[in-house]
Amino acid sequence: MAAMSLLRRVSVTAVAALSGRPLGTRLGFGGFLTRGFPKAAAPVRHSGDHGKRLFVIRPSRFYDRRFLKLLRFYIALTGIPVAIFITLVNVFIGQAELAEIPEGYVPEHWEYYKHPISRWIARNFYDSPEKIYERTMAVLQIEAEKAELRVKELEVRKLMHVRGDGPWYYYETIDKELIDHSPKATPDN
């Protein structure tokens, strides 16, 4: 181990002697036992910055930046045409004006909206108030019928308990003439 260390020092000294550069402090024997590697001839510069540059480990911002770039792209992709469309609708079509309703004419539910885009959305995507009312009334009727059936079932159960009846009232009693007693008469056959 000591021989390898000495061999390394000798080789460093030989290379330094051949290259003409001096080594650090010499401890004798022509520099064979030096304690350092060749020193730099010029002072060390750290790229003109305010000190030594460090490699700081921090989380990647790649996905954050990519998300924000794509978000801006898709907002521009959809927002600009939507803004142009709304501007054109407001300029060329405009809002509806209040007018007298002719006799015998029943307005549709979307005709009560002022803006044309609101009218289009109400006509194509929303149900009419009459349809919503009828649907709600149907649900209320079904729930009322269920409540009435629950009350009747509770009354039937009370009467069954009072009279000692059981669930057999669901089935008709079989006629006794249809029962075959022959297997019981001769069980060994």
Swiss-Prot record:
Primary location class: mitochondrion
Q: Which UniProt keywords apply?
A: Electron transport, Membrane, Mitochondrion, Mitochondrion inner membrane, Respiratory chain, Transit peptide, Transmembrane, Transmembrane helix, Transport
Q: Where is the transit peptide, renumbered to this chain?
A: 1-46
One GO biological process term: proton motive force-driven mitochondrial ATP synthesis
* InterPro entries registered for this protein in UniProt: NADH_UbQ_OxRdtase_B5_su
Q: Which residue windows are transmembrane per the record?
A: 73-93
Tell me one GO molecular function of this protein. Answer: NADH dehydrogenase (ubiquinone) activity
Q: What is the protein's membrane topology class?
A: Single-pass membrane protein
What GO cellular component term, any one, is given? nucleoplasm
Task: Give disulfide pairs as residue numbers.
Answer: none
Q: Where does the record say this protein resides?
A: Mitochondrion inner membrane
**Pfam families xrefs:** NDUF_B5
Answer yes or no on keyword Electron transport: yes
Subunit relationships: Complex I is composed of 45 different subunits.
- In UniProt terms, what function does this protein have? Accessory subunit of the mitochondrial membrane respiratory chain NADH dehydrogenase (Complex I), that is believed not to be involved in catalysis. Complex I functions in the transfer of electrons from NADH to the respiratory chain. The immediate electron acceptor for the enzyme is believed to be ubiquinone.
Q: Which family does it belong to?
A: Belongs to the complex I NDUFB5 subunit family.
Q: What is this protein called?
A: NADH dehydrogenase [ubiquinone] 1 beta subcomplex subunit 5, mitochondrial
Q: Which gene specifies this protein's sequence?
A: NDUFB5
